[in-house]
Amino acid sequence: GYTSRTVAQNPPYNFNTEHTWPQSNFGEAEPMKSDLYHLFPTDITANSMRANYPFGKAISNVTWQVGGSKLGNNSSGQLIFEPRDVHKGDVSRSMFYFITRYPVNYGGFFTQTQESVFREWNKFDTVGVVESNRNNAIALLQLKRNPYIDHPEFVDRIYSFATSNTRPTFAELNVLPIKVEFDSTNISEFTTQQIFFANSGT
């Protein structure tokens, strides 16, 4: 979750479930609402602070922070929620899963701005044992896996999650050898030249 706190208390426990993709964006409809891959246990206050704000890096006007998670403004002045460091990768991979599993992009919530941050977090907070075990446990129930937990590198092979844009192509042609020299050849003899073309573009 967002705060990683241990609190001994009597009921009510101030504990609930966070929908990483805000359920208000898809009208609390199933199967999105109960898809465990984007559900995480959380402190009620932290869940309330997150509300349905997008994710990002809080760099100014931080009005709430506990356990490393923050509510504040990003570099564009947008109010966002930043999860603690050890949960950043979990958030990113659950969001990549959700937009892949449910490509409608409910509420237009998955933006290019968030995607850039998620790509960074996917590499910053790599898959650990707990996240991997969680993936295995959920797969037993839902009969499907989060591929971005099994293969985080898949993220780099997808050009855009937020749009339907395709990767632009750039030719980067290399020819070897750079120079070919032709010399004299006797009658009834022949000379062979090899020229290699390699396109290392995209």
Predicted regions and their residues:
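Domain-level detector of nuclease and nuclease-like folds
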Residues: 3-167
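Hydrophobic residues on conserved beta-strands that form the core of alpha/beta folds
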Residues: 17, 175-177, 192
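Compositionally biased, intrinsically disordered low-complexity segments enriched
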Residues: 21, 195-196
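Hydrophobic beta-strand positions in extracellular immunoglobulin-like domains
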Residues: 45, 196-197
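Aromatic-residue hotspot detector
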Residues: 55, 148, 177-178, 182-187
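Surface-exposed binding patches on compact interaction domains or structured appendages
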Residues: 170-181, 201-202
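Short, solvent-exposed loop/turn segments enriched in Ser/Thr/Gly
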Residues: 186-195
